[in-house]
């Protein structure tokens, strides 16, 4: 019985490792913070991590600890609990242009034709790479704080709609919706 329990534990940890291996994580920012105490300053670290499966799921997390590896581990765990799904067109770009904001940071994301690549700065690039977007043009205006930029990017991605969901909301066919799209052809497959 004990041997079965032990073996089951190993299998569960192996399953967890396989599930974790499907995610790609990017360290966006590390910040050294100090707490002033009676004896001087006590230093710690805060980490911002973005993870994704490069197939449309992405999340971000923030972790704080006295040591850098522990802060990164906490941030990664928080990111896994904060995963969201984003509908991608052809598995490589956004369905439409979108804007997002958080605090004083604003971001504008534009769908791009194949071969454009990721044209985005800093923290936004990490989000797109882990999400699996290959072609996008992004611009950030206002705050360049990495936390605000990541949260503004997630705010924008939260509002991305696939043609299928828009058609369902409007009670029309997907082909009708795509035929109306400027410069689009009606043969594009909706996700």
UniProtKB/Swiss-Prot annotation:
GO terms for biological process: translation. Residues 23-86 form the S5 DRBM domain. It comes from the Bacteria. InterPro entries: Ribosomal_Su5_D2-typ_SF, Ribosomal_uS5, Ribosomal_uS5_bac-type, Ribosomal_uS5_C, Ribosomal_uS5_N, Ribosomal_uS5_N_CS, Ribsml_uS5_D2-typ_fold_subgr. GO terms for molecular function: rRNA binding; structural constituent of ribosome. Keywords: Ribonucleoprotein, Ribosomal protein, RNA-binding, rRNA-binding. Residues 1-20 are annotated as: Disordered. GO terms for cellular component: small ribosomal subunit. Pfam families: Ribosomal_S5, Ribosomal_S5_C. PROSITE patterns: RIBOSOMAL_S5, S5_DSRBD. PANTHER family: MITOCHONDRIAL RIBOSOMAL PROTEIN S5 (PTHR48277:SF1). With S4 and S12 plays an important role in translational accuracy. Located at the back of the 30S subunit body where it stabilizes the conformation of the head with respect to the body. The N-terminal domain interacts with the head of the 30S subunit; the C-terminal domain interacts with the body and contacts protein S4. The interaction surface between S4 and S5 is involved in control of translational fidelity. Part of the 30S ribosomal subunit. Contacts proteins S4 and S8. Belongs to the universal ribosomal protein uS5 family. This is Small ribosomal subunit protein uS5. It comes from Rhodopseudomonas palustris (strain HaA2).
């Amino acid at each position: 019985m004990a041997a079965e329990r032990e073996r089951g534990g190993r299998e569960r940890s192996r399953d967890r490792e396989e599930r974790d291996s499907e995610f790609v994580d990017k360290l966006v920012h590390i910040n050294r913070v100090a707490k002033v105490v009676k004896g001087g300053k006590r230093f710690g670290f805060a980490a911002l991590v973005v993870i994704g499966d490069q197939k449309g799921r992405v999340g971000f997390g923030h972790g704080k600890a006295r040591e850098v590896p522990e802060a990164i581990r906490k941030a990664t765990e928080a990111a896994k609990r904060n995963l969201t799904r984003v509908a991608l067109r052809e598995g490589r770009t956004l369905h439409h242009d979108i804007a997002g904001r958080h605090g004083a940071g604003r971001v504008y994301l534009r769908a791009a034709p194949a071969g454009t690549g990721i044209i985005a700065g800093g923290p936004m690039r990490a989000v797109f790479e882990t999400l699996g977007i290959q072609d996008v043009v992004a611009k950030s205006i206002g705050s360049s704080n990495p936390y605000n930029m990541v949260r503004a990017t997630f705010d924008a991605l939260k509002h991305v709609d696939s043609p299928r969901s828009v058609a369902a909301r409007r009670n029309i066919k997907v082909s009708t919706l795509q035929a109306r799209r400027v410069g689009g052809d009606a043969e594009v497959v909706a996700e």
